[in-house]
Amino acid sequence: MDAFGCGFSSRRQHRRDTGSCCRDLQLVLAVDVSYSIGLDELQLQRTGYVEAFRRPEIMRAIGTGRLGRIAVTYVEWGGKAVQVLPWTLIEDRQSAAQFAEALRRQPIRRISFTSISNVLAFARRLVHLSPYRGSRRVIDISGDGPNNAGVPAPVARNSTVTQGIVIDGLAIMLRDTPDSASIPDLDAYYRQCVVGGEGAFVMKVSEASQFSAAILAKLTAEISGLKVSGARQPRPEPAEYAQSYNCFIGEEMQERSIGR
């Protein structure tokens, strides 16, 4: 029995179970839809997740687990968060394809502001209220700017990690020149201020053409519990914390923009 109440009986036995029985992974996909991301990028981001769950690499990653099944929910966020797809059991190609199709049919949303702390709190609640239990619990958060609303990101990060939940990040860095809502070292911000927990990592997208490959590599790593390897794959960078890094840069930028 692990820390989350998940025993390790056979895969066959678990496939006969229903309800709140255990899964290898509870995965919250938390996707930034703030107005600082262009509509084209939003569509590329959505398409990247849809295509990923149709790929055989995802099923192979799921198959590496002891139980061969995971639970996934899809959230979109800005200043607030919205659960777009409910907790869904994925254990075979059919269930993965159904999840992908359900996501494809959802409208693209836009939400003002960028509150990493709010979405982390929202995702924590989803994990605890889920009908499923995972031997691993991961929040996969993507975004294109630092936290500028709610409590500071490190506070939310620490609250999440102390509950045994890992936070991984995808830093979206498509701008040639930063604007009032972005910073040039967003990947460093995510490593220092957002992600955390055992094996936590950050990946970055600096060109729109990288979305699909980065999303697939990130999901494969999270589902299998392994780091991404291979020269052709985007490489994750582990979390690292330095007291000298300014984790309040987003809040300071927001204050300057409104003239405080």
For the regions a protein language model found, what residue spans apply to each?
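Acidic, polar low-complexity linker/tail segments
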Residues: 4-28, 34-41, 133, 161
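Von Willebrand factor A/integrin I-like adhesion domains
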Residues: 172-229
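Sec-exported extracytoplasmic/periplasmic mature domains
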Residues: 47-58, 108, 124-132, 147, ...
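VWA/integrin I-like adhesion module and closely mimicked acidic/polar interface patches used
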Residues: 146-192
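Short beta-strand-loop
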Residues: 65-102, 179-192
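Von Willebrand factor
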Residues: 21-86, 98-142, 169-185, 214
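Second-shell loop/turn segments in exported
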Residues: 30-40, 72, 86-88, 102-113, ...
